């Protein structure tokens, strides 16, 4: 495209390639530099120089604090039980992302490649929780998106570039900060092709979405509508370069273990049974995943090729589910205990009851996600009655409460305490 075909600012003459935003009006354009200049004049304050505007939203190299992999993992450990290999992989990838940003800010001649991460594993194993925990500790903008809501351009649904808009919003519309952020996309396996053969019809939610995501993952200058939605002529856009954004994607990839077993020449007999041996075999197979297995599942080679780190989250054991109930900083048992303490009532869980809850969650086959529902159903009636009953001192949850549906043990206050 020749320069005369590029839109240019009607005031300073800069082309759309030289500015972050170029706002269009009827036969006229104005760039972000001129807007800031005019704003300074209107406020009767000196307008910043062009170079200062270009760098004002970019932190200096020394201001970017780089957490070590051990520091990152220690923060994740406070909320996520198990998944040691996945947590180490994520910690190293994020650490290298920080170093890459700092190298770019220092204009080093040697540039580091992105280590985009693909997390695979069963529902409720902690993939999304790892991502949400990262959002709490990182000094870069972070956003989470759901791949199942995405469609390729021209179809009803969410445009892929809206993911970048969310990151921009997380950065308070600071383009420079957004361009060094991290995006987590959940349920990525749901956009796999349903067949290995290329369809002659349009694939609205599969390969087409992978192709659209591929563009922003490998790096492009995306024109983002500030308020989201579909693009239309004469609309204002914000230009965001996605080249240095780190992408982490996760998915359950159901039956991927069988594809791996077929490649390795192993049998999967008994894998449908949720025995400890079957789970161990499945986790062992997922640890041996190769690019060809993911392609056979329905992911396109170009998409998978953008993820240097592929790591599986193992199915949670019974002991790990019990730990999730009680150990993390925001453990669900701690949450309910505090809720009852506000009513001056002690909530006591016997050890056997905790294991019974964990076993019930394991049978639900949704991992840690089932724990909250089980406790909510268990304690709902008590939370309704207790605020109106000043005679209750404590509630004890026993194993039979879970396995036999017996009511919890209610311990009454002494008459003197009530008086």
Curated annotation (Swiss-Prot):
InterPro entries: AAA+_ATPase, ATP-dep_Clp_protease_ClpX, ATPase_AAA_core, Clp_ATPase_C, Clp_protease_ATP-bd_su_ClpX, ClpX_bact, P-loop_NTPase, Znf_CppX_C4. Coiled coil: none annotated. GO terms for cellular component: HslUV protease complex. SUPFAM superfamilies: Glucocorticoid receptor-like (DNA-binding domain), P-loop containing nucleoside triphosphate hydrolases. The keyword Zinc applies. It comes from the Bacteria. Keywords: ATP-binding, Chaperone, Metal-binding, Nucleotide-binding, Zinc. One of its GO terms (molecular function) is protein dimerization activity. Component of the ClpX-ClpP complex. Forms a hexameric ring that, in the presence of ATP, binds to fourteen ClpP subunits assembled into a disk-like structure with a central cavity, resembling the structure of eukaryotic proteasomes. Belongs to the ClpX chaperone family. PANTHER family: ATP-DEPENDENT CLP PROTEASE ATP-BINDING SUBUNIT CLPX-LIKE, MITOCHONDRIAL, ATP-DEPENDENT CLP PROTEASE ATP-BINDING SUBUNIT CLPX-LIKE, MITOCHONDRIAL-RELATED. This is ATP-dependent Clp protease ATP-binding subunit ClpX. It comes from Chlamydia trachomatis serovar D (strain ATCC VR-885 / DSM 19411 / UW-3/Cx). The gene is clpX.
């Amino acid at each position: 495209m020749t320069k005369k075909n590029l839109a240019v600012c009607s005031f300073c003459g800069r082309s759309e390639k030289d500015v972050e935003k170029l706002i269009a009006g009827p036969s006229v354009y104005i760039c972000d530099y001129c807007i800031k200049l005019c704003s300074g004049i209107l406020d009767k304050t000196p307008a910043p120089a062009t170079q200062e505007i270009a760098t004002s939203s970019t932190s200096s190299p020394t201001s970017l604090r780089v957490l070590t992999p051990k520091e990152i993992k220690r923060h994740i450990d406070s909320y996520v039980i198990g998944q040691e290999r996945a947590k180490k992989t994520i910690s190293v990838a994020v650490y290298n992302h920080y170093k890459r940003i700092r190298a770019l800010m220092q204009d080093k001649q040697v540039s580091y490649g992105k280590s985009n991460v693909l997390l695979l594993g069963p529902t409720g194993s902690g993939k999304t929780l790892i991502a949400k925990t990262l959002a709490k500790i990182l000094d870069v903008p972070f956003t989470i998106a759901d791949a199942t809501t995405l469609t390729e351009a021209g179809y009803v649904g969410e445009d892929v570039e809206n993911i970048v808009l969310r990151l921009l919003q997380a950065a308070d519309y600071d383009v420079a900060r957004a361009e060094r952020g991290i995006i987590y996309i959940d349920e990525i396996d749901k956009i796999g092709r349903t067949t290995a053969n290329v369809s002659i019809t349009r694939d609205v939610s599969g390969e087409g979405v992978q192709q659209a995501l591929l563009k922003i993952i490998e790096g492009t200058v995306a024109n983002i509508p500030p308020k989201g939605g579909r693009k239309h002529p004469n609309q204002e856009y914000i230009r965001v370069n996605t080249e240095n954004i780190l992408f982490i994607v996760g998915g359950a990839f159901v039956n991927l273990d069988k594809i791996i077993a077929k490649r390795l020449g192993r049998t999967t007999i008994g894998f449908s049974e949720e025995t400890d041996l079957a789970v161990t075999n499945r986790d062992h197979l997922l640890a041996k995943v190769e690019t060809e297995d993911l392609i056979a599942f329905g992911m396109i080679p170009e998409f998978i090729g953008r993820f240097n780190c592929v790591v599986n989250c193992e199915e949670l054991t019974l002991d790990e589910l019990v730990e999730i109930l009680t150990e993390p900083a925001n453990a669900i048992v701690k949450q309910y205990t505090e809720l009852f303490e506000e009513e001056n009532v002690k909530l006591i869980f016997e050890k056997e009851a905790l294991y019974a809850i964990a076993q019930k969650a394991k049978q639900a086959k949704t991992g840690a996600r089932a724990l909250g529902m089980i406790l909510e159903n268990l304690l709902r009636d008590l939370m309704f009655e207790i605020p109106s009953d000043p005679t209750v001192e404590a509630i004890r949850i026993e194993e039979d409460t879970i396995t036999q549906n017996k009511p919890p043990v209610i311990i009454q206050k002494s008459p003197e305490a009530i008086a």
